[in-house]
């Protein structure tokens, strides 16, 4: 069995391509069911976010799984394979496992170290479990990846340093105020960056929001998002009297506030500290504001300097995580390699039991006068001999299967004990049983569709 991943993300595909491969909530469940009906695919999970669409499958053979999954993507979304082949990445086995650990821990995210993706991976896994498209392999792999991601954020600082300008402003504010609880935010201008910064401040405890804008209607629209108030630029001096934090991004061609305008306001405020963030280019706030006591002014360059420093810090943490991920891969692949042991052991015991049963039949034919008690003793003794003979080979097989040469060991063991025919028969029986289950499931779905048409 092979583990396979096919996907598109923000690194490989522009948004106009990614948006063609977006699963709806209902669509994901139906897609999982359809994909799981494919003969070669034993398990499947679909991970869909605004930045990535990924399909994880456990399949009989990697090349067949690749073809089926590629065709599935094309047919499900009605897109020719040629249109997305250059944007599609395909990873197998250890590469696919490593990719999942990187995705879960936020290492592969647009904003390195973000934690939202962990919840999305968990939701994708739970949906697969709910619709019974996961089995032994993915139940183990995804649980391990989710547990690792939680540990990564606990044991490293991968998500602790701001790597966006808007969040860097929040970090600066915390250094000045300690806490934003009860603080009042004044947003000057209704630009996107102002909104993002205000959103972060609001999430960190700031309670009152006022939006000042040249157009009152736009100010009102933004203020509503934070259940705040709005005012015009003419009312800015009055709004500054009660503000603790000012975020400015108006897009004006000149300064909207300087020392001359703010000095008398600071007197009325009794020089209560004022934290000001100018994220406009060109700048909104005159640098001469630095001359005023208790005015803490930061512009876009200050914030980008913090971001650059934090990006470097996250990169160092990412190197630590890479080492941790390699350890996780070894742990999983060691377990995964032992999965091939169970069918071999079962086949070996099957063969040994057949030989023992045949021997007992011959004894009964040649010695028909043996009592039931005597036959019981012989049967028990021969079974004991079989178990003793199998014990050491089975123990050694389990140990050697967990090494880097595990696959070769399993292959040699299979040939040494001539288990090919038994394994082939058991595999065929499993395929028949699986096909029967899929036919039953498909029939039930058709009945439901006929009863409850769209």
From Swiss-Prot:
Substrate binds at residues 49-52, 109, 114-116, 120. It comes from the Bacteria. Pathway: Porphyrin-containing compound metabolism; protoporphyrin-IX biosynthesis; 5-aminolevulinate from L-glutamyl-tRNA(Glu): step 1/2. GO terms for biological process: protoporphyrinogen IX biosynthetic process from glutamate. Pfam families: GlutR_dimer, GlutR_N, Shikimate_DH. SUPFAM superfamilies: Glutamyl tRNA-reductase catalytic, N-terminal domain, Glutamyl tRNA-reductase dimerization domain, NAD(P)-binding Rossmann-fold domains. Keywords: NADP, Oxidoreductase, Porphyrin biosynthesis. InterPro entries: 4pyrrol_synth_GluRdtase, 4pyrrol_synth_GluRdtase_dimer, 4pyrrol_synth_GluRdtase_N, GluRdtase_CS, GluRdtase_dimer_dom_sf, GluRdtase_N_sf, NAD(P)-bd_dom_sf, Shikm_DH/Glu-tRNA_Rdtase. Catalyzes the NADPH-dependent reduction of glutamyl-tRNA(Glu) to glutamate 1-semialdehyde (GSA). Homodimer. Possesses an unusual extended V-shaped dimeric structure with each monomer consisting of three distinct domains arranged along a curved 'spinal' alpha-helix. The N-terminal catalytic domain specifically recognizes the glutamate moiety of the substrate. The second domain is the NADPH-binding domain, and the third C-terminal domain is responsible for dimerization. This is Glutamyl-tRNA reductase. It comes from Brevibacillus brevis (strain 47 / JCM 6285 / NBRC 100599). The lineage of its organism: Bacteria, Bacillati, Bacillota, Bacilli, Bacillales. The gene is hemA.
């Amino acid at each position: 069995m092979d583990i396979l991943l096919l996907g598109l993300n923000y690194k490989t595909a522009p948004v106009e391509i990614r948006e063609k491969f977006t699963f709806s909530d209902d669509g994901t469940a139906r897609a999982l069911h359809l994909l799981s009906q494919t003969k070669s695919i034993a398990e499947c999970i679909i991970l869909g976010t605004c930045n990535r669409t990924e399909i994880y499958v456990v399949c009989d053979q990697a090349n067949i799984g690749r073809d089926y999954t590629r065709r599935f993507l094309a047919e499900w979304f009605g897109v020719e394979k040629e249109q997305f082949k250059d944007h599609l990445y395909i990873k197998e086995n250890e590469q696919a496992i490593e990719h999942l650990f990187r995705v879960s821990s936020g290492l592969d995210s647009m904003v390195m170290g973000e934690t939202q993706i962990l919840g999305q991976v968990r939701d994708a896994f739970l949906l697969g479990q709910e619709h019974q498209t996961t089995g032994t392999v993915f139940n183990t792999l995804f649980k391990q990846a989710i547990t690792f991601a939680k540990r990564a954020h606990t044991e490293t600082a991968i998500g602790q340093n701001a790597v966006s300008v808007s969040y860097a402003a929040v970090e600066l504010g915390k250094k000045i105020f300690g806490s934003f609880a009860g603080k009042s935010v004044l947003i000057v201008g209704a630009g996107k960056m102002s909104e993002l910064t205000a959103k972060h401040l609001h999430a960190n405890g700031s309670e009152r929001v006022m939006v000042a804008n040249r157009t009152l209607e736009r100010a009102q629209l933004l203020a509503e998002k934070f259940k705040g108030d709005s005012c015009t630029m003419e009312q800015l001096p009055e709004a500054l009297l009660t503000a603790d934090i000012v975020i400015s991004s108006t897009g004006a061609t000149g300064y909207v506030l300087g020392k001359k305008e703010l000095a008398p306001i600071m007197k009325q405020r009794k020089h209560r500290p004022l934290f000001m963030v100018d994220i406009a280019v060109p700048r909104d706030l005159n640098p001469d504001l630095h001359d005023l006591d208790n005015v803490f002014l930061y512009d876009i360059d200050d914030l980008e300097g913090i971001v650059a420093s934090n990006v470097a810090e996250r990169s160092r943490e990412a190197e630590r995580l890479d080492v941790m991920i390699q350890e996780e891969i070894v742990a999983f692949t060691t377990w995964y390699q032992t999965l091939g042991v169970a069918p071999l052991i079962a086949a070996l015991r099957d063969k040994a039991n057949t030989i023992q049963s045949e021997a007992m039949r011959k004894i009964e034919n040649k010695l028909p006068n043996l009592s039931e008690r005597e036959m019981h003793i012989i049967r028990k003794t021969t079974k004991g001999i079989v178990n003793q003979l199998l014990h050491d080979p089975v123990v050694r097989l389990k140990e050697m299967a967990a090494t880097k040469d595990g696959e070769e060991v399993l292959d040699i063991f299979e040939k040494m004990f001539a288990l090919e025919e038994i394994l082939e028969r058991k595999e065929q029986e499993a395929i028949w049983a699986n096909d029967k289950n899929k036919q039953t499931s498909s029939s039930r779905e058709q009945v439901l569709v006929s009863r409850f048409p769209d």
